[in-house]
Amino acid sequence: MEGQQKFNQLLNEINVYKQQGDLIQQQIELVRASIAEVDALTNTLDDLEGKDSVEAFVPVGAGSFIKGELKNTDEVIVSIGSGIAVKKDVDGARETIARQKKDLEDSLDKMLANMQQVSDIIGSLSAQAEQLAAVAQGNMSATGLN
């Protein structure tokens, strides 16, 4: 019965690591979405560069928009985290956004490395479980219980 207990323990560990991998994958997707938002913001700033005013649709809630005009496109209110936003010129905003993107990419790299570690552990545990199952199957065949 010791082999069965070890097998069950391995299966439990595999399930725990799979759940951990699922959580890491969700975090990876959130960070990738944030990077895409930062890229979209950078593109918007590039599109607005040198223009005094721009027509735009302004969100007013519930998926509704009003046509409006963006004036003074040389200043941007940029979120710096913790619910704090500051006014910056376009170049200052680009610098802040570039730092935010680098931080996000660094976080993504760490998450991907963690995901690889979890995947490697799952692979190792699965190999151990398969080995135990094969031994148990061999023992059952040898005793005629199969």
From Swiss-Prot:
Chief place of localization: cytoplasm
Localization (cell): Cytoplasm
One Pfam family here: Prefoldin
GO biological process: protein folding
Alphabetical keyword list: Chaperone, Cytoplasm
Gene Ontology terms for molecular function: unfolded protein binding
The keyword Chaperone belongs to this UniProt entry's keyword annotation: yes
Subunit structure: Heterohexamer of two alpha and four beta subunits.
Family label: Belongs to the prefoldin alpha subunit family.
Function: Molecular chaperone capable of stabilizing a range of proteins. Seems to fulfill an ATP-independent, HSP70-like function in archaeal de novo protein folding.
Protein's name according to its UniProt entry: Prefoldin subunit alpha
